[in-house]
Amino acid sequence: MVYATMKPRVAALVLLFGVALDVASFGDLRAQPTGTQVVTRGPARAVWTRERAHAWADSTGWLVGSNFIPSTAINQLEMWQATTFDPRTIDRELGWAESLGFNTMRVFLHNLLWQQDSIGFLSRMDQFLTIADRHHIRPMFVLFDAVWDPMPHLGPQRAPIPHVHNSGWVQSPGAAILADTASFEQLRGYVQGVVGRFGKDRRIVAWDVFNEPDNTNRPVYLAYEPIDKEAHSFILIRKAFVWAREMNPSQPLTAAPWRGDWIDPTRVKPFTAYMLDSSDVITFHSYDDSANVERLVTALERYGRPIICSEYMARPRGSTFQKIVPIFARRHVGAFNWGFSAGKTQTIYPWDSWDREYTAEPAVWFHDIFRSDGAPYDAAEVAFIRGITATAGRR
């Protein structure tokens, strides 16, 4: 991600709505829900062999979809909490995804949902999977996320800051836990409860262990981040991979590099190297143009594993469906663009909306494909997506 300097009006709103923190929200997560475990904990399994990874890829076919949150939710908590869970909108919008030929979606979870109501949370996940399966969509679930607001809280979520990109998205875990490495063990129950419940479920295609774990969100939320965030995230991601592997899921585990140089093997940072070496299948993020995407894919091919781009598509940066998706289709790289239906996340606005004031919809949307009523932002773009997914085929 690229962030610009936060303007005073936004800083004030973040302070007002984001810093008020209910410490009770970070209680003990170790309790397991009764009667929901379908996978038992054992020794952590090894990283898949390349042969097993490619057998999995052969069974899934070319994966293509979006990062998904319903238009009625501002963040992961509003999507999944019982009072705001919206299966009707989810069903409608996943129907639009099916109409594009999408067969997967990347969907974010949150540790606080487990703490709040583990059994109810698992039930809503199961309901989501039932809806997705009806539309022939197998999601990739994201367990942790280090991007945007580091002060999540349960209950009602704040309203969007007008015209500001992702103004209410929250990190998982928040800064209160991430700052204290001694507290990490309380997250084990969440990881193993979720992966244990769904680790053999054919409706799930993969698990993304930690989204952009070394993202310091500078300068938007930098002042509210743990001082040693990157080091602490490195500790947590290593634990999280072990916790997930102890449940022996049948789906692959992965975590995506998103910054730095991984084209030159001698310049790969230890954090990035760990994510790549620990992933059953390789994922990465790129909002760059087609030339750089080609270089990144070529570099990642040295790992000899299936490759998925789990974030791309920022139209003003040259990362468009028409320019990027043909590369992925030709090279059999899975593809998840950022943004699906325009709504409370407001990701039609660019990253610089944290600094530059917008008062109306931008002429060129940054992310997203559909308006909240199902009308496409760009009919020609939607026709292109349908054409290439039909040509590439869905297995």
Please identify what each model-predicted range represents.
Residues 383, 387-395:
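Catalytic domains of carbohydrate-active enzymes that cleave complex glycans
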Residues 11-28:
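Bacterial N-terminal signal peptides
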Residues 38-281, 285, 291-292, 303, ...:
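Active-site mouth of glycoside hydrolases
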Residues 1-7:
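N-terminal secretory signal peptides that target proteins for export/translocation
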